[in-house]
Amino acid sequence: MFERLEQIETRYEELGREMADPALIADQQKYQKTAKQHRELEDVVEKFREYREVQNGIADARGMMNEADAEIRAMAEEELASLEERLPQIEADLKLLLLPKDPNDEKNVVVEIRAGTGGDEASLFAAEVFRMYARYAEQRRWKVEVLSMSESSVGGAKEVIAIIEGDHVYSQMKYESGVHRVQRVPATETQGRVHTSAITVAVLPEAEEVDVKIEAKDLRIDTFCSSGPGGQSVNTTYSAVRITHLPTNTVVSCQDEKSQIKNREKAMRVLRSRLYEVEMERQQQALAKERKQQVGSGDRSEKIRTYNFPQNRLTDHRIGLTIHQLAEVMEGRLQPVIDALTAHFNAERLKAESEAVA
């Protein structure tokens, strides 16, 4: 591990020198590429330098233990205990930083939320979960753009498809895919009974054109009049677009914009991301089979979370996390949940990596 860390540090320093070269600065495209590589190595190098500093401090403290002065020996003993306590965490951080990066972590995401079992109550909850993600995105200074929304008659959402753009969005949102279950007393319930409803969430990394090759001959594009809640026509022009990818029978519709061109662009963004996810799943399954481990962080059929409103309780079933701050989470304060999930799945990756090496 340490030989690899030294190689990374050497490369980091080389990139730093290259960035100071006026010839590179003049070529902004190359400069940006070099700066990106430099940034990607920065966290590892800083942690490695911290590790080395602590190791040197431990060596110095041990040397001072031989001093004749009792006060100096006591200080050295205290310093040694403090540094040795820090070392295991730094080593764990280094191992984590050396894990292969998820190439999608920096990407924007397409979020698809659909009401499942529970009728009107499920549609209301789907709208609330979308609002929760929108509030969370606002706190992270991300941009949310609704691509498509199908409203229910009670003001909920049968389906919401949106793009969230910003810094490392997929890295924070990727563990949200799955079935989200809600337990509460609906406003229409006269007996005060708790009902259970469910929605599905899919989080897809937004694919660029270079990520997925789509042939024009593989697409069927239909246009139709936009419709609102209950099916009434809201637009007399054929601005709504439905795109079918014939080889996979993947269908995407978009009718939010008045312009057919804009609706087509939005639909293509979703289609690219769905096809990219299909290819990602195929690769993950092949890797899981090879390593004989289960891939479970993105299965949309997996019940991942329960929101119990009477008890103000959120439970994430994948990691056994329970918090009694549901009201705050629904306001977008989702970071503690995301941090716990990230820590859990990173630990799983570390374990899998260790077993693969063994």
From Swiss-Prot:
Family: Belongs to the prokaryotic/mitochondrial release factor family.
Keyword Isomerase attributed: no
Cellular component GO terms, alphabetical: cytoplasm
Keyword tRNA-binding attributed: no
Pfam entry (one): RF-1
Residue positions where N5-methylglutamine is found in the record: 232
Protein name, per record: Peptide chain release factor 1
Keywords: Cytoplasm, Methylation, Protein biosynthesis
Modification comment: Methylated by PrmC. Methylation increases the termination efficiency of RF1.
HAMAP family the UniProt entry points to: Rel_fac_1
GO molecular function: translation release factor activity, codon specific
Role, per record: Peptide chain release factor 1 directs the termination of translation in response to the peptide chain termination codons UAG and UAA.
Major place of residence: cytoplasm
Subcellular location, record wording: Cytoplasm
